[in-house]
Amino acid sequence: MLDALLPLDQQIFGKSQPGRFYVGPTLALELSGRTAWAAGHANPEELASFLAFCGCGSVILDEGICPPPTGWHRAETLTVFGLAPGKVLPLPAVEDALWNSLTLDAQPPAMTVAQALYPTDPARRDDAYSELCSKRSRGRAVVWALQQGEQTVCTVGAYAVANGQAYMACGQTAEPLRGKGIGGRLIVQMANALAAEGEHPVFLCAPERVHFYTRLGFAKLGEYVRFAAP
């Protein structure tokens, strides 16, 4: 998964946001707020010291490759799910009347998406808007939304399409329509479309979402672990 995310982010934002990335002989880091994403490996004590220097409170890594920073504790296990290129998943059931009331927008305005994702957090909304514009203009991001009238009620995106992978994230449904299946169907539709184009859709999910993605039919590909600072 990080094979798509880190190289693409560095390629696009490395010059304008140099403090966001660190690349060493055996380790690449991307800083996102107080969270670091780590690919590769490093000395655990040196990694702990560097993350503390950067003000990080957590790091996400592949424990099979990268030993955790010294003194940090395991916070949660994150599961990688995916759909192999060319594979097709069946669409989850949704009530016909509800689904027919929705319109798919395969190119929603970036600010509309950002506002739907972060309605009460202007800083994160603006960051999401800027990043989506930068990636989509280069053909490196795909975002879909469902509209009900004038309202955006569901969205999901592939926010890093690179190196044969499509990193899917930010699946969100408006609260009144949650639990009705529209989010699951939109996720499967996008994953099927990406897989049909030869991409490998992948995404990372928290423990409480494992059952949801398993039920949709996605295959477990691996795990990352989030470690928290002492």
Identify the residue ranges that each predicted region occupies.
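Conserved hydrophobic beta-strand within the GNAT/NAT acetyltransferase core sheet
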Residues: 168, 200-205
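N-terminal charged segments
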Residues: 1-67, 123
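Acyl-donor-binding surface of acyltransferase catalytic domains
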Residues: 39-98, 102, 205, 225-229
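A conserved beta-strand-loop-helix scaffold within acyl/acetyltransferase catalytic domains
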Residues: 124-172
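A conserved beta-turn-beta hairpin within the catalytic core of GNAT-like acetyltransferases
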Residues: 32-37, 160-169, 178
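Conserved acetyl-CoA-binding loop-helix of GNAT-fold acetyltransferases
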Residues: 43-50, 169, 173-175, 179-196, ...
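Conserved active-site tyrosine of GNAT-family acetyltransferases
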Residues: 67-70, 212-214, 218
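Short amphipathic alpha-helix that is part of the acyltransferase structural core
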Residues: 1-13, 79-81, 86-129
